[in-house]
Amino acid sequence: MITREFDTIAAISTPLGEGAIGIVRLSGTDSFAIAQKIFKGKDLNKVASHTLNYGHIIDPLTGKVMDEVMVGAMKSPKTFTREDIIEINTHGGIAVTNEILQLAIREGARLAEPGEFTKRAFLNGRVDLTQAEAVMDIIRAKTDKAMNIAVKQLDGSLSDLINNTRQEILNTLAQVEVNIDYPEYDDVEEATTAVVREKTMEFEQLLTKLLRTARRGKILREGISTAIIGRPNVGKSSLLNNLLREDKAIVTDIAGTTRDVIEEYVNINGVPLKLIDTAGIRETDDIVEQIGVERSKKALKEADLVLLVLNASEPLTAQDRQLLEISQDTNRIILLNKTDLPETIETSKLPEDVIRISVLKNQNIDKIEERINNLFFENAGLVEQDATYLSNARHISLIEKAVESLQAVNQGLELGMPVDLLQVDLTRTWEILGEITGDATPDELITQLFSQFCLGK
């Protein structure tokens, strides 16, 4: 009996809906045999690998022509999954792609689970776990810089760094083991405390340096979470729309019309800015609006950046002062909106430099982008073209654990503990790093990771 892991799977690999092309993908030992049953054209078993072949998809039971197609035939092992792959290129459309998928399933294929094609690439050694995760990052990338990080990870930059470090740790462990078991060998360098500590300090410094890229990598991957706050009707939603250059939030003259948290992305110098337009924070008896206010407070706590919008044409209110207070420990930019009207706000009572804007007149909006650029990019040296970045929360957590384990080794060596007693912590470091690439990852976690992928990938 063919196991579920190695039967033939099929799925639609293009987004459902109308389009020029739709693709139904098959992977597995029986891909060619199944496709041949429903394809009228060249014998797919005899065509050269990695070729496109013209023909028609036919229902073998009725003889009905389903569509005019081009079939890509790719023979293992030089494929994404390292299995035989068939890609049926149809005319785009929900009905035709679904019909062809159902034909493939009827003739012996199984509907693929989310991410199962990439999972097979991992199980068959085509990619490691970091590269598989990079595939999803490429799909989800919102800017060119985020995509570049994912492409470097797919190319193996992070894998190489982790694998090389694991190998060096393994060499150190082997050296310690030989010294313990065969002390009479003179041709092996003695694993003294000084020798081992020099190496483990190098490992710790390398991984700590990698951890320093985590904040920048997370920003490039996920964006700068930016909360737009202010009392009701100061122009928060209008500012959001202006930055997005389209109407996504409800903009009216009635206070309290944003009753929930609205999230949108805008591209700032190749980095995604996740704009969160919060409900105005104020006391209210409206239950729905109260929920929005609570979510706004939560968004404020979690934001990387806060844009506090004040009304320049009115004196500071108690609500304004409350917002100034609760946002004072955040990375904040204060915006004075409605500067096209006479200014009455007391700027002397504001704690920092402000940016005067008029969303209505589209004045000084570019200065907001300049300030964000200075805060996060130029001053922080955000992007280095050839650097390897940590951007995945799973990777960051595991590297932190590996550093902690190495710190335990180094502290033990400092206290004069015998090297052999510290083997456990050093071995644990080696195992933790293996979880990043998938060499030592529980099956349940692997299943969970790939379940986040879309069907057909």
Swiss-Prot record:
Annotated protein name in UniProt: tRNA modification GTPase MnmE
| Cofactor annotation | K(+)
Q: Which UniProt keywords apply?
A: Cytoplasm, GTP-binding, Hydrolase, Magnesium, Metal-binding, Nucleotide-binding, Potassium, tRNA processing
Which positions in this protein are listed as binding (6S)-5-formyl-5,6,7,8-tetrahydrofolate? Answer: 25, 87, 126, 457
What are the GO BP annotations of this UniProt entry? Answer: tRNA methylation; tRNA wobble uridine modification
* Subcellular location(s) of the protein: Cytoplasm
Q: What is its EC number?
A: 3.6.-.-
Keyword Secreted present in the record's keywords: the answer is no
| Main localization category | cytoplasm
